[in-house]
């Protein structure tokens, strides 16, 4: 899957999520970083994600209102789950039901690292 210009939700803002955001931004994706913890500091998160590439970044923290969640899920091309995020959350089940591909960090690195075969 080409990542450029895809809308990708990175679920979890820990070290893995920050690294995923950096890679996706470098590849030109439209990135939404989501973490259910509303006590996190948005500026601190931003300071850990280097700005590079042609991608864009939006950060969502805390519980998503149903309308916001539905709007977001309609527009996603891909979800990258951080390893610490439980895979049985209702929103994750909803993503599966909608057929949105859900990758881990290893799948993302594999796809991004693919080169052209000569």
Kindly label every feature range from the protein language model.
Residues 1-104, 108:
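N-terminal leader/targeting and accessory segments in enzymes
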Residues 105-118:
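Walker A (P-loop) phosphate-binding motif
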């Amino acid at each position: 899957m080409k990542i450029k210009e895809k809308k990708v939700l990175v679920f979890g803002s820990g070290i893995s999520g920050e690294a995923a955001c950096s890679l996706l931004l470098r590849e030109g994706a439209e990135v939404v970083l989501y973490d259910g913890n509303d006590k996190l500091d948005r500026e601190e998160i931003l300071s850990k994600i280097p700005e590079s590439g042609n991608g864009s970044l939006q950060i969502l923290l805390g519980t998503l209102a149903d309308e916001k969640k539905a709007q977001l899920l309609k527009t996603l091309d891909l979800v990258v789950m951080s390893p610490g995020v439980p895979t049985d959350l209702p929103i994750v089940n909803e993503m599966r039901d909608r057929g949105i591909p859900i990758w881990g960090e290893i799948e993302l690195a594999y796809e991004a690292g693919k080169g052209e075969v000569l």
